[in-house]
Regions:
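Cytosolic, long alpha-helical scaffolding segments
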Residues: 1-224
Length: 224
């Protein structure tokens, strides 16, 4: 009976994750193709959908908690779905913020070729997808692999910031555009962090190990 209530929520979480992953993709597609319609669609159509998902999923999870008072594994599953719902909502919010930066940049000459931003986006999209897959499949090993990708995202963020600081110091006319590019990189990095939040919960649910606040070396170690 309880499993029959949980499975539809899992399916909705997959749909929700696909939506926010596509939002990230649209923002970067618009930036690369200099086409404002993509980020505008994220703001005008997709963001309201994420808000509806977040509210509906929250209500369903709270209803299950109240009606069934689940214990042990079922309780951890419901609590994790609530946490995942909030992480996906934040990813949607960050995608909308990125859309505004992208529109600003589309309307102006490029500071530099966009190479690392789309690379970051591709990795972050895979992190969103695999974090949810790890939850659905109870795959803690996949969750730990996502931690490794987060290191790459952080390195790309740092590289982008270093390059743009150089541009700004040599040509002050690039400052405003450079700041928006830095904002994009920081938002992508935060989206990666929300994906790792989900993976931390997966590891706890599957292995019973709390890895929040651990350093990266301990997070991605193999279980003995």
């Amino acid at each position: 009976m309880l499993e029959e209530r949980i499975m539809p929520i899992k399916r909705e979480l997959i749909e929700y994750a696909t939506l926010v992953e596509n939002m990230v993709e649209k923002v970067i597609k618009g930036l690369m193709e200099k086409e404002k319609s993509y980020p505008l669609e994220v703001i005008e159509k997709d963001e309201p959908r994420t808000d509806r998902y977040e509210l509906e999923l929250d209500e369903k999870c709270v209803w299950i908690l109240a009606q069934f008072q689940p214990m042990a594994v079922d309780l951890r599953t419901i609590l994790m779905m609530l946490e995942m719902n909030r992480d996906l909502e934040r990813i949607g919010d960050l995608s909308s913020t990125m859309s505004r930066s992208a529109i600003f940049l589309i309307e102006r000459p490029q500071v530099k070729p966009y190479i690392d931003i789309p690379r970051m986006s591709d990795i972050v999209q895979s992190m969103i997808r695999d974090s949810v897959n790890a939850f659905i499949e109870n795959d803690s090993q996949l969750a730990r692999e996502v931690f490794q990708r987060d290191k790459t995202v952080n390195a790309l963020r740092d590289q982008i910031i270093r390059e743009l600081l150089t541009f700004m110091s040599s040509d002050p006319t690039t400052i405003e555009r450079s700041f928006d590019l830095i904002s994009l990189a920081l938002d992508l990095e935060r989206i990666g962090d929300h994906s790792t939040n989900i993976c931390e919960d997966v590891v706890f649910m599957v292995e019973g190990e709390v890895i929040k606040h651990m350093d990266d070396k301990n997070k991605d170690k193999d279980r003995k």
